[in-house]
């Protein structure tokens, strides 16, 4: 059975692309900084897309500070979490990226601190990036106890919550 993937992980794609759109429309440009959205595939098939990227590009950015934020399943607002550990706790994500996310969440214009957590089951692409030597962390909003849309045919656009 196929899962349409509206929440896992079209919502993550929306967040990444929307961030770029917001920067452009606001006229925000950074000196000596590049912001991009990397959309990897095959996360559900063993993090293959992110893993392939890390293997292909390992060492290319060693002289450039590089941070990766993996947005995954942005549906349940009350469960928005910064994941400092991944792959059911087996992989430690970057404390630097977690600190940057904390700083952004605590900014007076945002003022919405997020809890830290461990990906309770499975993994996000941040695990592959962290294992591959990149500084990465994940942000997701999914009820860990009840997600009737998760990994099944019910993960359709009508299950998305745009406010999240």
Question: Where in this protein do the model-derived segments appear?
Answer:
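Acidic/histidine-rich catalytic neighborhood of metal-dependent amide-processing enzymes
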Residues: 1-93, 122-126
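Active-site-adjacent substrate-binding region
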Residues: 74-164
